[in-house]
Regions:
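Hydrophobic alpha-helical transmembrane segments of multi-pass integral membrane proteins
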Residues: 1-200
Length: 200
């Protein structure tokens, strides 16, 4: 129901903003795709038409891929401006070149592909590869999009959570590559610490 409302909102707003959507909004479309796929798998499992997935792929698509892609979609243009303490001008959110959009689309699809890697194998290697792919995409987002290495050390207190959260999310994606046995514990860094700090 929430996904349907979100899709309706996009359809209503698209005619008004179709000439200047930020290229990073590609991630938002992929986030909706991930949530739709996860929801479909969950319904099939509950109906008994699909075997329970040991790798929890349907849960990860709904509660990890969906919010992370949303963060990359919205945060790709919003967080750098907030970190720079700049006024957000809607006119600056102009569409970028097709090559840039294609590159971001490729990154987003690669991000989603990592969940397929985990689906087809439930052993430690598939977990390492899946999280490794996601970690690379997320670290690119931090260094090349958010440019956290250039974030000033002094900024308003209300941005503290927004600055700390991406690092905890990165830790939650990197640690399963080296210690897959404790993947569920590392996911708490993403779900609880990372997402929680972003909302504060």
């Amino acid at each position: 129901f929430l996904l349907l409302n979100f899709g309706t909102f996009i359809l209503i707003r698209f005619p008004k903003r179709r000439n200047n959507p930020p290229a990073f909004f590609v991630f938002i479309a992929l986030a909706m795709l991930a949530d739709l796929k996860g929801t479909t798998l969950r319904l099939l499992i509950l109906a008994g038409w699909w075997d329970v997935i040991p790798s929890r792929t349907e849960i990860l698509l709904q509660y990890q891929a969906f919010p992370l892609l949303l963060i990359m979609g919205v945060g790709g243009f919003l967080l750098p401006k907030l970190f720079g303490n700049a006024v957000i001008d809607p006119k600056s959110l102009s569409s970028q070149s097709n090559s840039s959009i294609r590159f971001l689309l490729l990154l987003g699809l690669t991000f989603l592909l990592s969940y397929g890697v985990q689906y087809w194998g439930v052993h430690a290697l598939s977990t390492r590869i899946g999280y490794g792919i996601r970690a690379v995409v997320w670290l690119w987002f931090l260094s090349c999009s958010l440019r956290v290495q250039h974030v000033p050390s002094k900024f308003p207190a209300y941005l503290t959570g927004g600055r700390v959260a991406p690092y905890f999310i990165a830790m939650g994606l990197v640690l399963p590559v080296f210690f897959p046995t404790y993947t569920l514990a590392w996911e708490h860094l993403i779900f609880i610490t990372g997402f929680l700090w972003l909302t504060l």
